[in-house]
A protein has these predicted regions:
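N-terminal small/glycine-rich loop or linker at the start of catalytic domains
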Residues: 1-21, 112-127
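Hydrophobic faces of well-ordered beta-strands that scaffold small-molecule active sites
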Residues: 6-8, 44-46, 80-86, 106-110, ...
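Alpha-helix-loop-beta-strand connector modules within alpha/beta enzyme cores
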Residues: 8, 55-84, 140-149
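Active-site mouth loops of central-metabolism enzymes
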Residues: 8-31, 85-93, 129-132
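Glycine-rich tight-turn/loop motif centered on a GG-T
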Residues: 18-26, 52-69, 120-134, 152
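Conserved, mostly hydrophobic/aromatic
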Residues: 29, 36, 47, 108
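Non-catalytic positions within long, well-ordered alpha-helices that form the structural scaffold/packing
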Residues: 30, 34-38, 101, 148
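Conserved anion-binding
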Residues: 91-154
Length: 154
């Protein structure tokens, strides 16, 4: 019998919890991770969200929040492979790097090139203004250096 790896992305990067049910808090993330784990997922891809009321649709690189989410998810899902998002616009990777250093995920996203970040609504209008998600080689190498220092696989 062949083996299959199932990855669950617990949230999208900019999904609004007021419009779609997405977990935000460490307890919510752990609960949803456990449901996915019980359904067969062995990898959890995670975007961290701001914890202030009404701000759960926005990303955060607060390493304390990341640590709380990672700890709660790992306790809920023993042996789960934690996959941290690293997507950040611009050259400053200090936020995602701090989270990688704090939680030491087994794997982390490594965006291997620049791309257009686009999202359409059902009416074919932009959900937000199109933006360039820049990932020059120097930025990728900086992420690889951080990942190498923590034993995180890209």
């Amino acid at each position: 019998m062949s083996k299959t790896v199932v990855t669950c992305a617990l949230t999208g990067v900019l999904t609004d919890p007021a419009q779609h049910h997405v977990p935000v808090t460490p307890d919510q993330m752990a609960r949803e991770a456990r449901a996915a784990f019980d359904a067969g997922a062995s990898v959890m891809h995670v975007h961290f969200r701001q914890q202030a009321p009404g701000k759960g649709h926005l990303p955060t690189w607060d390493s304390v929040v990341a640590s709380e989410i990672a700890q709660a998810s790992r306790e809920a899902c023993p042996g789960v492979i934690f996959n941290q998002s690293t997507g950040v616009v611009g050259p400053d990777i200090s936020g995602p790097a701090a989270c990688i250093r704090a939680i030491r995920p087994e794997i982390a996203a490594c965006n291997a090139g620049t791309l257009n970040y686009l999202k359409l609504r059902d009416d074919c209008k932009w959900a937000w203004p199109p933006m360039v998600f820049d990932n020059p080689v120097e930025k990728i190498q900086a992420f690889l250096d951080v990942m190498g220092g923590t034993g995180t696989r890209p």
